[in-house]
Amino acid sequence: WEPDHELTDFIPDKRRRGYDMRKFCKLLLDPDSFFELQPKFAKNLVTGLGRLDGWSVGVIANNPMFQAGALNPDSCDKAIRLMCLCDAFNIPIIWLMDVPGFNVGRKVEHERMLFKAIRMVEALCNLSTPTISVVIRKGFGLAYQAMNTSGMGAWGFYSWPGAEIGFMDPDVGVNVAYSNKLEGLDKEGRETERQ
């Protein structure tokens, strides 16, 4: 068995560099089989249908090119729609995860972020169709759980080499834990201190 280098080389080595998950889906699935649903709505999440080795599958994937792939109320609704569609026709779902978390702030709170996140997790828990999840680069916080981890019922759970999984992004954790110490340092000192 030899890995597909076009697929493995597609993901950038630098963790902050974005990539287009739509292109990744087209590489992963059978040639010319990926059909994206709602491509102009909630661009931070890619949903679609395709074929993998001839089998029909649904795809739910974070898109790091938009809002770093973070989930917001619209992307939660988009994921729920695809889950309901695939569940109705017993189409397995592949989850491709590269999620830094949920968006936060006044705007998303007014858009009922918490309610939409809970609805997404509820829809996930009610799925009866087979699912597998792959952490491509990162999975942090509650958004990691909402993207179908093994604890949420995934039939298979895999991670890409170098994937990061945790409660929060390590850089954010350092800023939270050492904010007082970092305030007194200049920019060069901060980078040195983080390492």
Where are these regions (language model features)?
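Ligand-binding clefts of soluble mixed alpha/beta catalytic domains
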Residues: 1-195
